[in-house]
Curated annotation (Swiss-Prot):
It comes from Azobacteroides pseudotrichonymphae genomovar. CFP2. Substrate binds at residue 110. SUPFAM superfamilies: Pseudouridine synthase. HAMAP family: TruA (MF_00171). Belongs to the tRNA pseudouridine synthase TruA family. This is tRNA pseudouridine synthase A. Its EC number is 5.4.99.12. The active site is at 52 (nucleophile). Formation of pseudouridine at positions 38, 39 and 40 in the anticodon stem and loop of transfer RNAs. It catalyses: uridine(38/39/40) in tRNA = pseudouridine(38/39/40) in tRNA. GO terms for molecular function: RNA binding; tRNA pseudouridine(38-40) synthase activity. GO terms for biological process: tRNA pseudouridine synthesis. The keyword Isomerase applies. InterPro entries: PsdUridine_synth_cat_dom_sf (IPR020103), PsdUridine_synth_TruA (IPR001406), PsdUridine_synth_TruA_a/b_dom (IPR020097), PsdUridine_synth_TruA_C (IPR020095), TruA/RsuA/RluB/E/F_N (IPR020094).
Length: 249
């Protein structure tokens, strides 16, 4: 059996997230359907994570198994040919047989985009606010995140997860061409975690919460303490890293 990694991107606007579910079309479902058509046999793909409904991905990965050696260049071209225009396959590559798209990922990176101006061309990808935020305070809050590992407070209730421990290696706010961008990198993320963190930091940027309040929310390990979240449409999964050993020479 041969294992292959798929590198892809998608606009999440028309999908109920990544993972297959009974009530709605998902990205995983679309790719599996098209891949199964091309290979003329049912194929199951395993993603590196589960983005929520409306969340986009500049880079997502998934793996699948196939008995024969595939022409990955040809398969990539053919798959792009029948997938809808809001899903793009960058490449398909062979990997080691025990490589896993989800469990072997070293890190994942997300970005959230905020604007203060009307933008008719990017309304679906930017969260618009009326007044500029205090990025100095928000970056102060960002620096605090790496001091903690239990992010229960930012996890959606009733999430099916064994642990709420995440190791955040980067969190910062930057402004590029008038757009505020929050970048966060960690070994893993909880459901709704990034959107909850951003929503709470916006409250800090509006002087509705203090840095002390932010610490209290984290240390409470209680989702009830959380007051704010942000819409999914401005959130992007932008990178996933893997150890070199999973790739074939």
């Amino acid at each position: 059996m041969n294992r292959y990694f798929i590198y892809l991107a998608y606009n999440g606007r028309n999908y109920c997230g990544w993972q297959i579910q009974p009530n709605g079309i998902t990205v995983q479902q679309r790719i599996q359907q098209c891949l199964s058509i091309l290979l003329r046999k049912s194929v199951t793909i395993i993603g590196a994570g589960r983005t929520d409904a409306g969340v986009h991905a500049n880079l997502m990965t998934a793996h699948f198994d196939w008995e024969e050696i595939l022409s990955t260049t040809s398969l990539t071209k053919r798959l792009n040919g029948i997938l809808p225009c809001d899903i793009l396959i960058y490449k398909i590559i062979p990997v080691k047989k025990n490589a896993h798209a989800r469990f072997d990922a070293i890190s994942r990176k997300y970005k959230y985009y905020i604007t203060y101006q009307k933008n008719p061309f990017r309304n679906e990808q930017l969260f618009r606010l009326k007044q500029p935020l205090n990025k100095h305070l928000m970056n102060e809050a960002s620096n605090i995140l790496s001091e903690y590992s239990d992010f229960t407070s930012f996890c959606k209730l009733h999430s099916n997860t064994r642990t709420n421990v995440c190791r955040i290696s980067k969190a910062e706010w930057n402004t590029v061409q008038g757009i505020d961008i929050f970048t966060i990198k960690a070994d893993r993320f909880l459901r709704n975690m990034v959107r909850s963190i951003v929503g709470t930091m916006i409250d800090i940027g509006k002087n509705k919460l203090s840095i002390t309040d932010f610490r209290k929310i984290i240390e409470s390990k209680n989702h009830i303490m959380l007051k704010s979240s942000v819409p999914a449409h401005a959130l992007f999964l932008t990178d996933i890293e893997y150890p070199n050993w999973i790739f074939k020479n």
